[in-house]
A protein has these predicted regions:
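Conserved ABC ATPase "signature" region
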Residues: 98, 113-131
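The feature captures the beta-strand-to-loop junction immediately N-terminal to the Walker
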Residues: 34-36
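ABC ATPase nucleotide-binding domains
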Residues: 230-251
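Helix-to-loop junction immediately C-terminal to a conserved catalytic motif
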Residues: 49
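A short, proline-enriched helix->beta-strand linker immediately N-terminal to the Walker B motif
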Residues: 154-158
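Conserved ABC transporter NBD signature motif
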Residues: 57-65, 74, 134
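Catalytic Walker B motif of ABC-type/P-loop ATPase nucleotide-binding domains
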Residues: 160-164, 169
Length: 251
């Protein structure tokens, strides 16, 4: 099991933000995290990444408790790309991706063949070979997202956390990015708003509402008109496409 979470709870200013969150994700599985605005998706992502302390939780990566991993070792096992990742304007794509090797290097270490191989592999995974020398301020929104995901991949993590990476991208780039993400050889936990994207590309879904998990399972086993009505307060029809995926239409 790549990542397991048991009874995760978060309190901020004495208020329960997340309560009793539990789920598991297998190696190389893509897990979609869904829920309305304010349901706790970003808080859960940031807690898993170690940026917000949990009031209680057992979080393990490949059986190793996160609480026992030093920060540098944690960054070798888990990578996080937040919603609004940024970079210095004059850094090139290759410079940014190379920053992903920081957890594997100490000050004044020489750049190694292993570092180069990890960076090149990450660049190829996100199809950035033709953009290596382009600076950050010249990249489109989709190119910036791919660049930051490549940086995270250069960490060589077991688990990759992506907080709404397709927001503000047009449909073409949403689909392109989701195809690249789901082809990665790592476990991906990805926060999404689009139910159709989640149903098409994720093997498992976790539905959050008011800081609690209300459903978890494969898209075709949990996405129902009743669940959508209860969670997002909209009516929906669900059909199966000729490709075997779900198509959700809103009334």
């Amino acid at each position: 099991m790549a990542i397991s979470v048991e009874n995760l709870s978060v309190q901020l200013q004495s208020k329960d933000i997340l309560s009793g969150i539990s789920f598991r994700a297998a190696q190389s599985q893509t897990v979609g995290l869904l829920g309305p605005n304010g349901s706790g998706k970003s808080t859960l992502m940031r807690t898993l990444a170690g940026l917000i302390p949990a009031a209680s939780a057992s979080i393990c990566i490949s059986g190793d408790p996160l609480s026992e991993l030093p920060r540098r070792k944690l960054a070798r096992r888990l990578a996080f790309v937040p919603q609004h990742a940024d970079a210095e304007d004059e850094l090139t794509v290759r410079d940014i991706v190379a920053l992903g090797r920081t957890p594997h290097r100490r000050a004044f270490d020489f750049w190694t063949a292993e570092d180069s191989a990890a960076v090149n592999e990450a660049i190829a995974s996100m199809k950035l070979e033709n953009l290596l020398h382009r600076t950050w301020h010249r990249l489109s929104g989709g190119e910036r997202q791919r660049c930051h995901i490549a940086r995270a991949l250069a960490q060589k993590p077991d688990v990759l956390l992506l907080d709404e990476p397709v927001n503000h991208l047009d449909i073409e780039f949403q689909l392109e990015l989701m195809k690249l993400i789901t082809a990665l050889p790592v476990t991906v936990v990805i926060a999404l708003h689009d139910l159709n994207l989640a149903a098409k590309y994720c093997q498992q879904l976790i539905i959050l509402k008011q800081g609690k998990v209300i459903a978890t399972g494969s898209p075709d086993s949990i996405l129902t008109p009743e669940l959508i009505q209860n969670t997002w307060r909209v009516k929906a029809r669900i059909n199966q496409t000729a490709f075997g995926t779900l198509n959700i239409q809103y009334a």
